[in-house]
Amino acid sequence: MAEKMTLKDVEFQEKLNTGTSKTNNESFEKNGYLVVKDLWNPDELYRENTNEEGQKNYWGKREDQFKLIPKEMQVEGSHSSYWHPQYRSIHSQIRLKLEKIIGKKLYNTYYYDRFYYPGQALTIHADRPACEISVSVHISDNVKERWPLWIKTPYGENHSVKLDPGDGMLYKGCERPHWRDPLPKEYRRTWYGIKVEKKGLYYHQVFFHYVLADGVRSHFAGDSCK
């Protein structure tokens, strides 16, 4: 989760933060991201799409313990959840897997899942300090083709990453600009040959965020300085 940024803001943050989140994984250091196949069982992450809009900020362990914000702050018209109870223990379990991959100890900060709908995009941005080491996990979708997540590498190339359900893209959230182009709309023909937009399409993913235990952002553990 990040506030919308201008391109100038993104460029400034990239220049300011590049090289500040060192790990022991050579490929991760070179590219600023890493695809982790089969990171988690997508069935354990699945939640039914209800075609809602807005943002639910959870404060308790029950699914009815949340505050609803009618307008999602980053992707207008989407439906997102901050600290949904279903993912609470998974957040820590995934952290243990990522620590082995990067060779560094991590602290949990927060997690955030979002249902995107056709026509919606994630504008280019770099993340706030609590998202130093992050992973975006594809949960489920019912669209025709895999929808890519884009990321800019430290050497200036824009890479397109397509994930299967359960796969994750591990990335340096504060350092590497990332985005999604609009989720394509799909159409069907009626009995009369009229082209109409398909309804009920979605793409669901979850971000799990962490900070390096020995890094300059360690005090953001638990998302305590948001």
List PLM regions with ranges.
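Catalytic core of non-heme Fe(II) oxygenases with the double-stranded beta-helix
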Residues: 118-176, 193, 200-206, 211-225
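Intrinsically disordered, low-complexity domain-flanking/linker segments in eukaryotic proteins
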Residues: 187-195
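Non-heme Fe(II)/2-oxoglutarate
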Residues: 1-102
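A structural signal for short, well-ordered beta-strand segments and their strand-loop junctions
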Residues: 35-37, 107-109, 170-171, 207
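A short, polar/charged loop/turn motif at coil->beta-strand junctions and beta-hairpin connectors
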Residues: 27-30, 107, 202
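Active-site loop architecture of trypsin-fold serine endopeptidases
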Residues: 183, 195-198
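Conserved double-stranded beta-helix
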Residues: 74, 80, 91-148
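Short, Lys/Arg- and Gly-enriched loop/turn segments at beta-strand edges
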Residues: 177-186
